[in-house]
Amino acid sequence: MPLDTKIKKVMVIGSGPIVIGQAAEFDYAGAQACRVLKEAGVNVVLVNSNPATIMTDNALADEIYLEPLTAKTIKRIILKEKPDSLLCGLGGQTGLTIAMQLDKEGFLEAHGVRLIGTNAEAIDKAEDRQLFKDTMRQIGEPTIPSEIANDVRTSLDIASRIGYPVIVRPAFTLGGAGGGVAYTPEELEIIAHTGLDASPIRQILVEKYIFGWKEIEFETMRDSAGNVIAVCSMENFDPVGVHTGDSIVVAPALTLSDKEYQMLRSASLNIISALGIVGGCNCQFALNPDSFEYAVIEVNPRVSRSSALASKATGYPIAKITTKIALGYTLDEIKNDITGKTCACFEPALDYVVVKLPKWPFDKFAGSSRTLGTQMKATGEVMAIAPSFEMALLKAVRGAEISLDTLNAKPLTEENVLSRLKHVDDRRLFTIFEALKAGVAIEKIHEITRVDNWFLAKLKNLAEFEAELAGGMTDARYLRGKQYGYTDRALARLSGAAVLPHRSAVYKMVDTCGAEFDAETPYFYSTYDDECESRAFPRSGKETVLVLGSGPIRIGQGIEFDYSSVHCVWTLKKMGYDVVIVNNNPETVSTDDDTADRLYFEPLTDEDVMDIIRVERPIGVVVAFGGQTAIKLTKFLDASGIRILGTSAAGIDLAEDREKFDQLLESHHIKRPRGMGVKTLQEALAAAKELGYPVLLRPSYVIGGQNMQIVHDASEVEKYMNRILSTGIENPVLVDKYMMGSELAVDVI
């Protein structure tokens, strides 16, 4: 089927500001959509309120409105621009909710605007809890015992019928907002009230809580002709009850039998077809690990966080293909850009393992609850690719920037390990590893956590290897350690070896087809093998520049750094360079396989980056656009003889090191609050006493106010310094007199 020639002018609704549950993945999806529309010769009207996005660039749309994302604003722009079509499935829940409101009011029909892609009826069937439940019943797909409530009293009546505990799921919300697990009527009363307020249609689903079942996702794709494929299966490390955005996710699903896989794949294809979804769709299932019983949890009838993860995990660009389908193309008419030989109706095949690890903001909010549930708390995520689960997991952990390069995390409380295993929190992975090292049986850990035995066995492999390492380093142990994903620094620390054998990583290609066809798009991940597919990949002969990305989205370091990195790449390409980018965030435009000339999906650490430099031999490295993640690597790269492009390593250190910067200001007689650089608790207490309270404590090499604090007495200084010193700082902490007043910022170039 050719392009729908009735489509001349399309409005695209973005996702607005980054919030928990709706982050950079929608800029990635929206930017892909705008590019596809422009390439098709369609006039694009973009509405988004977030200026720190690639999609709001002039090159990606004909008309750009940086306006509040409200129904009133969208109506006003539709009246002015008169688009014939509206694409709403790529802007997260925001765009979907607004489009549905305008459709229900009859505004779209009255002004000749049609929803392209998935229509309003299909969206309603997926998002409205009662309609969804009715549809599942009609096609014979099992759902968890549940009922709809529109008020608190009804929710209490439902819970008394189906039995506690129950999960509350508000309709038309994102990231589990307003939901939660209630074990008592008192808890349900609070959660139901919150959930009703969170739902734009004041509707909640009260559902039986099935503790211990596996949570499995299928990312699917369907065109208007009814062709449907499963793009990717994904499995949550945590059982049902933890929001998928807060769970470690593995792709493809690794613990399913063939019967279980085929059963859930068939169910996902039945569901997307019955709902009438046109484009990408995410289906979530609960699977009883002790039988073949399963239940449908929910469906997202739009591009989602899981879509971005599945796209980067497989190399199958879900947002791009969703947009082409919305334009009228069918799956067999859309080419696979990575192989250049297959079409979009081929289901991707993975010959590697992908692990996603969430990035939580608890370092910013030290006193907040770390308990994980159905409301998402993570601000971002990292992704790692490797031949094995163990290697992918260790890559993800060190790439998450949580000051860890192994699973040996210091406990946060004095509780014994078995007690801590009962806590569903962000430290659970590390607590499980601690328990395995302490000799707790896999069966006992599974009984407490309900984490699948397969994952526990893989973690035990690492625990046993570390115990073996304590006996000393050998060549064989070194190679096993590298294949498990350990860095040289970690292996030296765990073995006590002063000198290690050395082996550099080689790079394999993501090709969507399990190496059945040669890939044309250079998208690489590291492993320890004999053949390096990156070295063998043909080069243009141009000089190469390596750009470091910014890693996971976190408070203080958000999508604006991806925006900067992408513009850096585009500019360098225009200047005639081959550009290589290194990043590990699956939500971003920078990790699109066609942004740079070559993409390395790797952790942003010294060893990982140096291995890439050895293969690529760039004339220099750009660190200026990767936020604090890239800046922190400057000293190491400079000391290794790598040229830093832009501001020199010495210049960066002068600005980032608090003590050196203070001395610079002093030498130029520039006024600033009186301050002193300190490295110990005693120095900090003495400085604070001399300056007089309140004082401001600020570490070096941080962003977004990370670990900055105003303190009012010696006890607060002691508490702060103990926390900072436990992270192993290299540069001074500045103690300066806190001054009340206005703050001004000036950008210079």
Language model features by range: what are they?
Residues V12, N461-T487, G496, E516-T521, ...:
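C-terminal non-catalytic scaffold/interaction domains in large multidomain proteins
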Residues T184, I334, A490-F524, D713:
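Amphipathic alpha-helical
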Residues M1-E141, N150-D157, A396, K508-I670, ...:
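ATP-binding N-terminal substructure of ATP-dependent carboxylate-amine bond-forming enzymes
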Residues D157-V166, A686-L696:
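Acidic/histidine-enriched active-site and ligand-binding environments that engage anionic O-linkages
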Residues P2, D27, Q32, E39, ...:
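ATP-dependent carboxylate activation and anion-phosphoryl transfer catalytic cores
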